[in-house]
């Protein structure tokens, strides 16, 4: 009797690498193609690791901003940022590098501003500053101070 082959189990890093590579390829077709790829990934991957979900939602927020879907962008950015602890737990040595490339802060601030939710934009500026992501978030916060 033939031995049943074991299912292929990928590491979180391998799953993340596959997601990023697939997204890069899809993004050549524009933000709509990137969104289609990411939506299919969520539909077909029933159990993406939460750390990978952080990056997937971050990529989705960026594509939604490019497409002008501000409500979707704000929601995706919030979801991505909600998974940051999972990202840090899965990639403790790469977390700062991954965080530096995260678009969710920038795109979330943009989305909240476009939607007229300046308090939401301010909160994201404060959160980015607390994580030490750069002085430009302090400048953004200062430009939104009037909304307090």
Range-by-range predicted roles:
Residues 75-85, 117-135:
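TPR/TPR-like (Sel1-like) alpha-helical repeat modules
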Residues 6-9, 42-49, 129-131:
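Solenoid-like repeat scaffolds
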Residues 10-24, 48-68, 78-81, 85, ...:
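Amphipathic alpha-helical repeat scaffolds of TPR domains
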Residues 49-51, 84-92, 130-141:
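Boundary/linker segments of alpha-helical solenoid repeat arrays
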Residues 52, 72, 95-103, 133, ...:
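Structural signature of alpha-solenoid helical repeat junctions
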Residues 26-40, 70-88:
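Helix-turn-helix repeat elements of alpha-solenoid scaffolds
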Residues 63, 111, 131, 144-148:
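TPR/TPR-like alpha-solenoid repeats
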């Amino acid at each position: 009797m033939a031995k049943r082959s074991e299912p292929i189990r990928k590491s979180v890093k391998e799953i993340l690498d596959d997601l990023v590579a697939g997204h890069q390829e899809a993004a050549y077709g524009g933000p709509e193609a990137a969104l289609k790829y990411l939506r299919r990934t969520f539909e077909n991957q029933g159990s993406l690791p939460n750390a990978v979900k952080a990056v997937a939602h971050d990529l989705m927020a960026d594509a939604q901003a490019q497409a002008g879907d501000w409500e979707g962008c704000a929601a995706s950015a919030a979801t991505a940022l909600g998974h940051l602890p999972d990202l840090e737990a899965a990639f403790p040595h790469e977390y700062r590098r991954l965080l530096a490339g995260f678009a969710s802060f920038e795109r979330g601030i943009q989305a909240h501003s476009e939607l007229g939710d300046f308090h939401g934009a301010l909160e994201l500026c404060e959160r980015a500053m607390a994580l030490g992501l750069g002085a430009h978030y302090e400048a953004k916060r200062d430009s939104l101070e009037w909304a307090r």
